[in-house]
Design a protein with these regions (language model features):
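Hydrophobic/aromatic anchor residues within beta-strands of the central parallel beta-sheet
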Residues: 220-222
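Conserved SAM/SAH-binding loop
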Residues: 224-231
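Glycine-rich phosphate-binding loop and adjoining beta1-alpha1-beta2 segment
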Residues: 2-35, 174-218
């Protein structure tokens, strides 16, 4: 959203999420690049959060909704379609917010007349089922992961960290994270990656994101080398890896490093598939070597499109254009959806739940997705620590009830509490 984000009616609202150094919601919105206003712009699409006023006369007006592990959006005009919104689960909030932005983006970009006029959502507990069904709510989480290795700290890797950083840890200092990447943050990362701001451009990705994680209270270690087939982890290293690299060679080596489990996500590429995401869990029925050898050989690279032709006219070589055209497109809201799915997979693992070896979805139409449940494997303890109890979070809140609404648009997004 090039016009930024407008947020209305949040004066004095407490911040209940662990986002240092911010203490209030207003501080967090301003610090993260939003614009706190008295009255949100009227000529932008609307996203309603909670029980706020509806303004349903807009061309685009949707409401976020959740219950437990299920989250998504429904049109404001469609009464009675909200979920129960009783059971808190951070990842369903991440998911529903990202889906709302994806719908607004498609509405503004054009090409999808259904955007904003439909129900869109997913259950992270039962992704193969209808997210509005009661059985998709899932259980209350009592344990959270305590040791993880993150491979790649770009768009997807930073989305993982954002989701992990919002989880309600009782003792975040019990969490050990290893961050592996060899690259530096570039200006393009500011618009594609959730934790990149202009102040850290030029820094090593590992160091900038480790700093963010340590402010959250996590313990970190960094590895500044490429992940490749000759890389091995030790017995004392985290047994679970989350992979977010956009590199077939590295992804094909995921099962060679010695991790007990690997959960990875990739995003779509090109103007047709930039809204796509696909997650894998290893070990699975297919080897990583076989998956990426097949996918790379079948990938179509379109350097004949106008943007690439314009670059060629300025002197760009064909080899470079081919590499650029074959890269994934970094829409941060797609990365956030993928992160919710991956971290949801991780939380099911930590709490002894079932697993899915493949989840393949597309935000143009999330109903058309492929979900493959994993075979029952050997019992596995990835390491865990206690989740904060809901009663403790409730005591941190004030008597002010936060029931907001929000607007998203080519100019801004806005957030307004009930009666604001």
């Amino acid at each position: 959203m090039l016009g930024g984000v407008e947020v209305e009616g949040i004066a004095g609202m407490p911040l209940l999420l662990p986002l240092r150094p911010y203490r209030t919601l207003e501080e967090a919105v301003s610090g993260l690049g939003g614009k706190v206003v008295r009255a949100a712009s009227r000529d932008v699409p609307l996203v309603v959060v909670g029980d706020g006023r509806e303004d349903a006369d807009r061309a685009f007006a949707v409401r976020t909704t959740f219950d437990g592990w299920a989250g998504g959006i429904v049109p404001v005009r469609a009464q009675g379609l909200r979920l129960a919104e009783r059971q808190e689960f951070i990842l369903s909030g991440v998911l529903s917010g990202a889906v709302a932005v994806a719908e607004a983006f498609q509405h503004l970009r054009g090409g999808n007349p259904a955007a904003g006029r439909r129900n869109v959502g997913l259950s992270l507990w039962r992704p193969e089922a209808d997210w509005r069904e009661p059985q998709t709510v899932g259980p209350v989480i009592t344990r959270l992961p305590s040791a993880l290795w993150l491979i790649g700290i770009g768009n997807v890797g930073q989305a993982y960290m954002w989701a992990l950083g919002l989880l309600p840890y009782e003792n975040p200092n019990e969490v050990q994270l290893v961050l592996q990447d060899y690259d530096m943050l570039a200006p393009s990362n500011d618009s594609t990656s959730l934790l990149t701001q202009p102040t850290v451009i030029g820094a090593r990705k590992t160091r900038a994101i480790a700093d963010w994680a340590e402010k959250r209270g996590f313990r970190t270690a960094i590895i500044e080398r490429r992940f490749a087939s000759d890389f091995r982890v030790g017995a004392d290293d985290p047994a679970v890896a989350l992979c977010g690299v956009d590199n077939a060679l590295a992804r094909s080596a995921l099962e060679d490093a010695g991790f007990s489990r690997v959960i990875e996500a990739g995003l779509g590429y090109g103007i047709r598939d930039y809204l796509g995401f696909r997650t894998h869990v290893f070990p699975g029925s297919r080897r990583a070597h076989d998956i990426w050898r097949t996918e790379e050989s079948g990938r179509e690279v379109r350097t004949d499109l106008p943007a690439y032709q314009a670059l060629e006219a300025t002197g760009a070589d064909q080899c470079g254009l081919t590499k650029l055209a074959g890269r994934t497109v970094g829409a941060p809201f797609v990365g956030a959806v993928a992160a919710a799915v991956v971290v949801g997979e991780l939380l099911r693992m930590v709490n002894g739940g079932h697993a899915y070896e493949l989840i393949d979805g597309h935000l143009r139409n999330l109903d058309h997705r492929t979900v493959v449940r994993a075979a029952e494997g050997q019992p596995f303890n990835p390491g865990s620590t206690e989740a904060e109890r809901a009663a403790k979070r409730d005591r941190r809140s004030t008597a002010t009830e936060f029931q907001p609404y929000a607007c998203v648009g080519a100019t801004p997004l806005a957030l307004v509490p009930n009666g604001g």
